[in-house]
From Swiss-Prot:
NCBIfam families given in the database record: AAC_6p_Acine (NF000224), AAC_6p_group_E (NF043067)
Pfam families linked to this entry: Acetyltransf_1 (PF00583)
Highest taxon above the source species: Bacteria
Gene3D superfamilies attached to this UniProt entry: 3.40.630.30
Positions bound to substrate: W22, H25, Y66, E79, D115, E136
CDD domains in UniProt: NAT_SF
Name listed for the protein in its UniProt record: Aminoglycoside N(6')-acetyltransferase type 1
PROSITE patterns documented for this protein: GNAT
């Protein structure tokens, strides 16, 4: 397995995996992806097999605003991670997360946070397997006023 930061030439591999994680409109993804790869406080990684098949992606950021459950700032934040089902439980997600931890230290981060939907038990289990622990549960509300 080979893990590398994403460049412009790898947008199609990233897009394919990103659409599996967040099934949305490709044109919206592409526009956002092109912006993300230019931002120093964002990290995008792809994992490839020895035969150059893209099998996993990770997106992370450095957040300077308050992050639920953390005590410091800045905080590394796992924005999204996806491993093709047939490659799960083989250490790929661990390898991706370790790369973020190394990168985040350049920004003086001492905490690494993430979130998951309350009902996404698969994500909860993955986070725990990667060394994260639950800090709090939050339900967001909104009210239209105009």
């Amino acid at each position: 397995m080979n893990i590398m930061p994403i460049s412009e030439s790898q947008l199609s591999d990233w897009l394919a995996l990103r659409c599996l994680l967040w099934p949305d409109h490709e044109d919206v993804h592409l526009q956002e992806m092109r912006q993300l790869i230019t931002q120093a406080h964002r990290l995008q990684l792809l994992a490839y097999t020895d035969t150059q098949q893209a099998i996993a992606m990770l997106e992370a950021s450095i957040r300077y605003e308050y992050v639920n459950g953390t005590q410091t700032s800045p905080v590394a934040f796992l924005e999204g991670i996806f491993v093709l089902p047939e490659y799960r439980r083989s250490g790929i997600a661990t390898g991706l997360v370790q790369q973020v931890e190394i990168w985040a230290k350049q920004f003086a981060c001492t905490e690494f946070a993430s979130d998951a939907a309350l009902d996404n038990q698969i994500s909860h289990a993955m986070h725990q397997a990667l060394g994260f622990h639950e800090t709090e549960r939050v339900v967001y509300f909104k009210k239209n006023i105009g």
